């Protein structure tokens, strides 16, 4: 009979269910699904991912989570369906010393991009040509707020003994040089904005927003982000009907 050595921990059984793409198998466009996918990857825990075809939910899923849309999680055979509560549960349960904490150190790292997606949604849904400039201006204002935050050094980066002006921040991500829950929340939305706004409004994030572009370049260099992103065409398909022609 084989037994565990004293102090040996058993890996939890984790299965994440995410929205499937248009082919019914690949990863679909769902920023909340990607958010949890990134968190699990960054935690370094073993887990399985199942894509759910929303056009024909398999019978076993109807039994497992009736009336529930992805993302949802099965953790040691226990179903969890609220993605905010799932995030909190994973952060508390998959904790040091075995797993890293992902909570940001600075509250503003979470808050700074909170209005960006709402401004994008209003912009992409607008069909009135004369109103377009105002919606675009509101979106750019949020990008400017994000850019200012990313270019402003965090307290960790400032030398209190130096008389010189603090330099422009060179940190990789929102809260420092490590990806945190704040990035898992914002990056999937930024990717959607970049793809959909370009496709349907010919909008590019202005090059002058150097902090935003530095952030995106660093993020796209990380597999935890790029390998959890849907294909661009999935994002474009999602917004094909939403982004109606301006009249």
Swiss-Prot record:
One of the record's GO molecular function terms: chloride channel activity
Matching CDD domains: GST_C_CLIC2, GST_N_CLIC
GO cellular component terms given for this protein: chloride channel complex; cytoplasm; cytosol; membrane; nucleoplasm; nucleus; plasma membrane
Its EC number(s): 1.8.-.-, 1.11.1.-
Biological processes per GO annotation: chloride transport; regulation of cardiac muscle contraction by regulation of the release of sequestered calcium ion; regulation of release of sequestered calcium ion into cytosol by sarcoplasmic reticulum; signal transduction
Native organism: Homo sapiens (Human)
Name this polypeptide is given: Chloride intracellular channel protein 2
Bridged cysteine pairs (disulfide): 30-33
Notes on activation and inhibition: The channel conductance is regulated by pH.
Subcellular location: Cytoplasm; Membrane
Gene that encodes it: CLIC2
Positions of the GST C-terminal domain: 76-239
Record membrane topology: Single-pass membrane protein
Major localization class: cytoplasm
Protein family: Belongs to the chloride channel CLIC family.
EC class of the enzyme, as a word: oxidoreductase
Region feature C-terminal, mapped onto this chain: 107-247
């Amino acid at each position: 009979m084989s037994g565990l050595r004293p102090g040996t921990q058993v890996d939890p059984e984790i299965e994440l269910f995410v929205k499937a793409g248009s082919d019914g198998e690949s990863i679909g466009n769902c920023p909340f699904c990607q958010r949890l996918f990134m968190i699990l990857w960054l935690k370094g825990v073993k887990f399985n991912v199942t894509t759910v075809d929303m056009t024909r939910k398999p019978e076993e899923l109807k039994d497992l989570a009736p009336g529930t849309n992805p993302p949802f999680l099965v953790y040691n055979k226990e179903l969890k369906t609220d993605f905010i509560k799932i995030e909190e549960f994973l952060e508390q349960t998959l904790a040091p010393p075995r797993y890293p904490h992902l909570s940001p150190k600075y509250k503003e790292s979470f808050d700074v991009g909170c209005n960006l997606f709402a401004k994008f949604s209003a912009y992409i849904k607008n069909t009135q040509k004369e109103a377009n400039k105002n919606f675009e201006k509101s979106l750019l204002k949020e990008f400017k707020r994000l850019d200012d935050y990313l270019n402003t050094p965090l307290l960790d980066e400032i030398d209190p003994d130096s008389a010189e002006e603090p330099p422009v921040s060179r940190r990789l991500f929102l809260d420092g040089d490590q990806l945190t829950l704040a990035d898992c929340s914002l990056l999937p939305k930024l990717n959607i904005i970049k793809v959909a706004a370009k496709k349907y409004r010919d909008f590019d994030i202005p090059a002058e927003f150097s902090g935003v572009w530095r952030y995106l370049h660093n993020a796209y260099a990380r597999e935890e982000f790029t390998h959890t992103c849907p294909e661009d065409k999935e994002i474009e398909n999602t917004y094909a009907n939403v982004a109606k022609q301006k009249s």
